[in-house]
């Protein structure tokens, strides 16, 4: 049974980037891609397995917003720019979820390319990310964010 142990087979295959196994498991209707708060998608996003993320999103049962949009937050945290792009192409994904945590994590960890991609979405607020970049001594990110017209004067002065 592929759904045994909260779909452990799918979760491990996704984490390892084993695309063929993921595809085979998703063909079985007993497989639940949302099991364990969509850990399969979160893990694929965290480890940068773009093809696995794409396959999981093709399956209508996959909820990319599960666990407060954790897939995009984890992809941003670990600098997985291509995964962030794929997730943003899905209209269900909210990059501003959980108080703009995706861009905050990208700023904290120095992932400028991820920040550039996230800021294409008008729902993302760069103000707290600027403060986080200052706090974490990320001068390149600070310089980039200061160019964004959404940055308030109050944030600039902090």
Predicted ranges, named:
Residues 29-31, 60-62, 91-93, 122-124, ...:
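Ankyrin-repeat C-terminal turn/loop position
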Residues 121, 131-158:
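Ankyrin-repeat-protein effector appendages
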Residues 3-11, 34-42, 65-73, 96-104, ...:
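Ankyrin-repeat boundary/"N-cap" motif
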């Amino acid at each position: 049974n592929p759904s045994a142990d909260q779909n452990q087979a799918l979760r491990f295959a996704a984490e390892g980037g084993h695309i063929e196994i993921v595809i085979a498991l998703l063909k079985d209707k007993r497989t639940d891609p949302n099991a364990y708060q969509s850990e399969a998608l979160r893990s694929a996003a965290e480890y940068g397995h773009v093809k696995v993320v794409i396959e999981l999103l093709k399956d209508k049962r996959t909820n990319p917003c599960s666990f407060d949009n954790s897939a995009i937050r984890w992809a941003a945290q670990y600098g997985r720019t291509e995964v962030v792009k794929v997730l943003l192409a899905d209209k269900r994904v909210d990059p501003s979820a959980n108080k703009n945590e995706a861009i905050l994590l990208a700023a904290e960890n120095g992932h400028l390319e991820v920040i550039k991609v996230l800021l294409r979405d008008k729902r993302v607020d760069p103000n707290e990310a600027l403060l986080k970049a200052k706090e974490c001594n990320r001068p390149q990110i600070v310089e980039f964010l200061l160019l964004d017209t959404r940055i308030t004067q109050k944030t600039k002065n902090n």
